Amino acid sequence: MWGINKLNPSEPSVKVPYKESGHMIRGNNVEILTLAENAAFVYWVTGEEKFARFATDIFNVWLVGTYYMNPILDPEKSCGSVGGWEPGGICGYYDYEQIHDDLVMHAAMAYDFAFDYLIRHPHAHLKAIGKDTKTVAAEVFKRFINIGLVRGGKSGNWNVNGWNIMLRPMLVLDHNEAYADGKGKEYYLNLLVNESTPYHDAIPDILKTYDRVT
């Protein structure tokens, strides 16, 4: 991104590497998506479409942009893997750390609360490429989930925070039979509620490490 000297804005802009600006960019995007989330909730409560329209304008831009993203690469393995879709390490789909992939949390909530309006008002680009909002949203949400399931930490704080990122997009998916790969909300929720994986403990194993004293 281009950085501006606040003390002297007339100075030429300076290109700032993502590794030095990433959290700031993500923070700005979280702030914007939170506005969409809040507006969608107000629409759900009141039925006033002006709030749904506001949320949809934000969500649709995020959705289309994210649809064309690939997971970040880390050829030097500073995060524990080469990135992309390779299991292991801590990289998220969007952020350097999976536990900071919180854009999807706010996007999923906006999607859920303004769902009916979003479906009726797809982004123009989706119509141009012959896709609908529901299909693209599911694909994008599942990317965040699938990356989260093979990244982060198996136990402790990392594990719980990783599930926190993944839970909301899981809940807005349809049932298993809606998807060609058979992976809908039931499939993913089973991994949280019942079945631990090599990368994340499920709730029964989380409780085994819970210290009732401290």
Located regions from the model:
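Aromatic-lined, polymer-binding surfaces characteristic
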Residues: 25-214
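Acidic/polar surface patches and capping/hinge elements
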Residues: 19-21
